Amino acid sequence: MEGWLGNLLAKSVKDKYIPVIVGRRDLWNKVFTPKSVNPDDNYEALEIVGDGVASYFFPSYFLKRFPQLNSPKGVKTVARLKIYYGSKKSFSSIADSLGFWKFIRSGPVPVNPSTRESLLEDTFEAFLGAVCMAVDDEYSIDGLGAVVAYKIMADIFDDMDISLEYTALFDTVTRLKELMDVKKDVLGGDAVYNHRGDTTVITLKGRVIGKATGAIKRDRAKEAAGQALDLLRREGHFREHDDDAVVKVAKGPAGDGLVVAQSALGGFTVFGAESGVVEGSGGTVAQALSRVVGTKRPSAVEVAGGDYKSLLKEYLESVGETDSVNYIHEGVTVTMTRKGKPVATANHLVKKVREQLASRDYYRTVHAKGV
């Protein structure tokens, strides 16, 4: 564990702190021990400390990364970012992508996807708490450990492509509910979800407006809600979001391979023209550009070792399928579905890389089996 932990900390933590943190074996034994394994000596206390650090981190970080949100209109978006990226799904995905799972002591409790997610989330928060406690204890400076933990989280989130758009921050189920609330008088009813077996059907006044199949109820609901939103939009029913449409892209070059997006709230965000990855942001174009990392990041295709999304699309078209694959993103995890059924997952901080990695894994499977 010491080698893994040292490598994990090396990117974000000053050299002098690393042995202080890694050397606290008493804390790390707790970090990876849930209450179900040891009711008296587990991660619960550290988890509370880590949760407090995360609660401070998110609003502070997002206001620094997106200065345009430092306004009355931006408060709602900051709150939503905090909810979305501080969720169980987000923290568990981060912990999983960093390799936490192999160290967690699950004990006699059966592990299913839900308990696995909870264990990963709790452990990540306990990890932050352990960093705080180790540094504070060594230097007898209250709060110094929180500064170190903040830097770790900042480096994790700096590598994420974070969108401020309404459709990225709110899932389809939430957006459909909001549409129903706003347009209730026009639509004359509520969207009703009917779950039977592996199928979810959404009806509005008895009319089917969305349908999806698959093993995971939550994913089915999101896919069916997406169909419902598309259908209602085609029929002229959609919610106008002047206040929520935070980013409005103004196409145009702003340096080598970069595009500037102007916010409705007055700031600017710089994206990679091809990758779509957020490279920098600020109150002015100059400030946003000054924060762009100088080194070129590998593209999603380069990370995956090929354009597997295109290869998979060509393969499916050759067997008579079009538009049968969807990508459902939760935090740093993507679930690929084919005809509504989950077929592959991948973890990565960058959305396009996640999709290429999932496509690669599934392409290799179907190409080998010919299914």
UniProtKB/Swiss-Prot annotation:
One Gene Ontology biological process: RNA processing
Domain RNase III, first and last residues per copy: 10-136
Keyword RNA-binding (UniProt): yes
Enzyme Commission number: 3.1.26.3
One of the record's GO molecular function terms: ribonuclease III activity
Domain of life from the UniProt record: Viruses
Catalytic activity: Endonucleolytic cleavage to 5'-phosphomonoester
Enzyme class at the top of the EC tree: hydrolase
Entry keywords, A to Z: Endonuclease, Hydrolase, Nuclease, RNA-binding
Record SUPFAM superfamilies: RNase III domain-like
InterPro entries: RNase_III_dom, RNase_III_sf
Pfam family, one: Ribonuclease_3
Protein purpose: Digests double-stranded RNA.
Protein family (similarity comment): Belongs to the IIV-6 142R family.
Name the record gives this protein: Putative ribonuclease 3
Organism of origin: Frog virus 3 (isolate Goorha)
Lineage: Viruses, Varidnaviria, Bamfordvirae, Nucleocytoviricota, Megaviricetes
